[in-house]
Curated annotation (Swiss-Prot):
Gene that specifies this protein: bamC
Lipidation (S-diacylglycerol cysteine): C25
GO BP annotations listed: Gram-negative-bacterium-type cell outer membrane assembly; protein insertion into membrane
The protein's assembly and partners: Part of the Bam complex, which is composed of the outer membrane protein BamA, and four lipoproteins BamB, BamC, BamD and BamE.
Protein name: Outer membrane protein assembly factor BamC
Amino acid sequence: MATLLQTSKVMKVAGLSLVVFLAACSSDQRYKRQVNGDESYLETPPLKTLNIPGGMILPLQNGEYDVPSATSTGAVGKELDIRPPLQALALLTGSRIENSAQSSKLLLENTSEYSKLWSQVVSLLAKKNYQISQKDEAAQTLTTDWITWQRADENVPYQGRYHVSVSQQDYQTTLSVSSDGLKQGEQDITDPAAIQRYNVLMLNELAGGLSQQQEEAGQNNAKDSGALTVQSGSDNTGLAQIIVRAPYNVVWNRLPYALESIGMQVTDRTRSTGSIAVTYKGRSSSDWKALGVEEPSVREGNYKLQVGDLDNRSSLQFISEKGKPLTQSENDQMVAVLEAAFSKSTDK
């Protein structure tokens, strides 16, 4: 009986210790950004000048392997933040990123699609309940109030204020985010790496919301687009491609179902670059008959489908795993196949 009681006490103590350990882990998030390992290197003594006994004759000195003295001002040990930098995301069609210590920018093609970008940004901030402390409609600039970032890797959440602006120049529209202050609790943060991290976080919030709006608008347009006209064409180098007489957003949203209906399974797609990865396995003769077209001679396998934005039209180019586009004959066959597939997907 004594042994059983002792075992029970040990199990209770072990269970209590586990609860305390898990509670500590759940409240202290520093382990997510700190080095986990041996820190004895921090106790390495500094280099000293070699003491030479009197009367000893030394070989000629060669400074090739001298270790230069250096003063390190960076963080070490537990103070070193091992988290990778945040990646700014180019989520919008035709967008690219320009990142610096001062600001994070989303660069867009100056097309009609982004003609209302400023009003979309203002609407998005309101939707996310981000308060605006100052706004200049004419200059298309604003300053947000303090925004709190609740993150699992910070014990005390950061708060940031941001300058947000939209500008047009020549062929380019720019959405820019820069810091107007960053703090953690009551402590002002001036570390450039932290400021850049939270600039990128804010830009990604805006890009993500705008991308969702773009996707929803494209889906609504696709519902009303009806049958699409498809024809054969060629790119600037003379290689065969397919031209669809519909805007990029419409074609992009209609493609998944159309491709599936002709035996092409979409394995990956990236809207901002217009890239779609597909695996072609063909269809049965009865399926092709139901679609109203003859079976194309395109070989089964993996293809990259590159979708191009030609304003009120879109281009499609299939590229094989070996980097070769379709032949003119194969391309012409796919024109008929896709036109039939798009006509079947008008209500999707």
